[in-house]
Regions:
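Hydrophobic-face positions in mid-chain alpha helices that act as interaction patches
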Residues: 157-169, 180, 186-187, 201-204, ...
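Short, flexible, mixed-charge acidic loops at enzyme active sites
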Residues: 98-112
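TPR/Sel1-like alpha-solenoid repeat signature
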Residues: 82, 193-196, 200
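Short coil/turn linking the two alpha-helices of tandem helical-hairpin repeats
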Residues: 93-100, 147, 202-205
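Acidic, glycine-rich segments characteristic of secretory precursors and extracytoplasmic regions
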Residues: 1-14, 125, 237-241, 247
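Flexible helix-coil transition and linker loops at the boundaries of alpha-helical arrays
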Residues: 62-74, 142-158, 164, 176-183
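Conserved, well-structured interaction surfaces
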Residues: 17-96, 116-130, 136, 142-143
Length: 306
């Protein structure tokens, strides 16, 4: 999927010879080397959507007193489920349907809102995006009860706070359990707002997109940690591939500019990601080089960052 979204520099044909990565970057979905991958993306995405719908339907029927923090916690979980449903649908639309600027009026992807739904019908791009927006607006209002409180603001105030599994809210001032830690790995008020900005921009609703993006940026200013403070040293192609170059990377996972991230604890071993970080290459004097796999493509989005 990252190859499809043009995240990596695949221009060096001596390094990148794997056909399906190159085909994916060119959107050649019907290529025989890609078919199984495309089918798997579709299957996994709609399994996640089904799980979100199942959670929404069950939690709606659950009494708030069963949650440690009552109605606030119930609404937070429900909001995250709605946001997850919207996020997965939005990505499926971007992968498998034309963008609104090229909309041909055809139906491409179903928007599944109930569980189970064995044979959902595909719908057109515009009503599809309307459903994404509706789910995100609802999700944003549901998670606001926690994320806009003093505790919620603290939990999202910096990359370190957002991405830490340590429970910073466990003290006497807040007394929240581990469930409220690591908000950067959950769809919070500000990550939902940022996603809503993306959806609005994709739909051509630029004023709404600007309003949502401004809300996120202004929050970053108030918290003292800007979301757009980038540190790409040692990651992009132009920075070299020696061990020393990569050791200069002070924020390898770019936590400083992450609002939301998903993770899989088993991916490094189970999914074979480890193989992409082998130090197999060496210089003429035998010094090992960091892997050339999947170096990020540097794209400057703003001509003036002032």
């Amino acid at each position: 999927v990252d190859c499809m979204s043009q995240q990596y520099d695949l221009s060096n044909k001596d390094i990148f010879t794997t056909t399906h990565y190159i085909k994916a970057s060119k959107f050649e979905y019907d290529d025989v080397s890609l078919v199984d991958y495309i089918d798997n993306i579709w299957t996994v995405a709609f399994k996640m959507i089904a799980n979100a719908n199942d959670l929404i339907q069950h939690i709606e029927q659950t009494d708030a007193h069963l949650f440690e923090k009552g109605e606030m916690e119930k609404k937070m979980i429900m909001g995250e489920a709605y946001a997850c449903r919207a996020l997965m649908h939005f990505d499926m639309l971007r992968l498998f349907a034309p963008a609104p600027v090229n909309d041909d009026g055809q139906a491409y992807v179903p928007y599944v809102e109930t569980y189970p739904d064995i044979h959902p019908e595909s719908i057109k791009v515009t009503p599809f995006l309307d459903k994404v927006v509706r789910d995100l607006v609802k999700a944003k209002s549901l998670v606001a009860d926690f994320d806009t409180t003093a505790a919620g603001v603290l939990a999202s105030s910096s990359g370190k706070m957002r991405m830490s599994k340590a429970n910073i809210l466990a003290g006497p001032s807040f007394n929240y359990g581990d469930f409220f830690a690591g908000r950067g790995y959950r769809l919070t008020y500000y990550s939902i707002t940022a996603l809503l900005a993306r959806v609005y921009q994709y739909a051509g609703k630029n004023e709404d997109a600007f309003r949502c993006a401004s809300e996120v940026v202004e929050y970053g200013k108030k918290s003292g940690t800007l979301f757009y403070q980038d540190d790409f040293a040692g990651v992009t192609v132009n920075n070299g591939t020696s061990i020393a170059d990569f050791d200069q990377k002070s924020d390898f996972k770019l936590k400083s500019s992450l609002i939301f991230a998903a993770y899989n604890e088993k991916a490094y071993e189970g999914a074979g990601i480890k193989s992409y970080f082998n130090l197999s290459s060496k210089t003429e004097d035998g010094t090992p080089l960091a892997s050339n796999y999947f170096q990020l493509k540097r794209v400057e989005l703003f001509t003036n960052r002032g």
